């Protein structure tokens, strides 16, 4: 039994779930592995980022005991930063577009954060603009700005990716994962590519995202999808992008709950659909890795699981 003194101590070391053709149309002798990041204490992969950003902030002097952390977020990064901030007695302010789930906003407030909403029509760009305005007006504030900060992919390069190699070795055929800020995908993909040069890298986005050549537009899958190209993809040889509809993502989110007891968010459902498609186009015996980024409880009001 691991004894901890703060919830921050429980971040990481998440299990890996193995899927075979028992429940899904996966080719014979192939497997899909999902890193269950929804089991982090804050309920998402972003716990790793929150821990890393605040740790690096203290190391570089950007954060002191009097700092107020300000960040634009769809929710999970805010939850992660608020969770880690508790240990250091830091104030947190998060700017969230109105469209994102009320549960995530309630969790941030429960962890002591101030949540400020921006119009849905302005997207995450509006939240970024508002966050920068707040940072200019509030003394002793720090704006990590995950969408531009190289510490974002670095967090996963140094934490998530080494765990994956330790657990699964270097025989993986493909890495398939959702792209939101781009940090989880870029940091993990770069580490894996350095150790498994032949690994395929497949990004996952919802309809209404631009990575696969589409036009920006509305979508109900939360946590992935971009309005602009993340800056972390330079010199990263991505093999392709899989665009998943809300209907596909929600359908597999429900299946993962009912068939496997995996209570995950819709970005996990989308990632699994994409991983399944990748496994089906690869030779038998292939090993596909994906990430389940967050937990179901923050989306219950969306009616996804009914």
From Swiss-Prot:
Cofactor: pyridoxal 5'-phosphate
Alphabetical list of InterPro entries matching this protein: Cys_Synth/Cystath_Beta-Synth (IPR050214), P-phosphate_BS (IPR001216), TrpB-like_PALP (IPR001926), TrpB-like_PALP_sf (IPR036052)
Molecular function in Gene Ontology: cystathionine beta-synthase activity; cysteine synthase activity
Domain of life (superkingdom): Bacteria
GO terms under biological process: cysteine biosynthetic process; cysteine biosynthetic process from serine
PROSITE patterns linked to this entry: CYS_SYNTHASE (PS00901)
Coiled-coil residues: none
Amino-acid biosynthesis keyword on record: yes
Pathway(s) served: Amino-acid biosynthesis; L-cysteine biosynthesis; L-cysteine from L-serine: step 2/2
Catalytic activities: O-acetyl-L-serine + hydrogen sulfide = L-cysteine + acetate
Residues that bear N6-(pyridoxal phosphate)lysine: 46
Pfam families for the chain: PALP
Signal peptide: none
Binding of pyridoxal 5'-phosphate, residues: 76, 180-184, 267
EC nos: 2.5.1.47
Annotated Gene Ontology cellular component terms: cytoplasm
UniProt subunit comment: Homodimer.
Similarity section: Belongs to the cysteine synthase/cystathionine beta-synthase family.
PANTHER family membership: CYSTATHIONINE BETA-SYNTHASE
Name of protein: Cysteine synthase
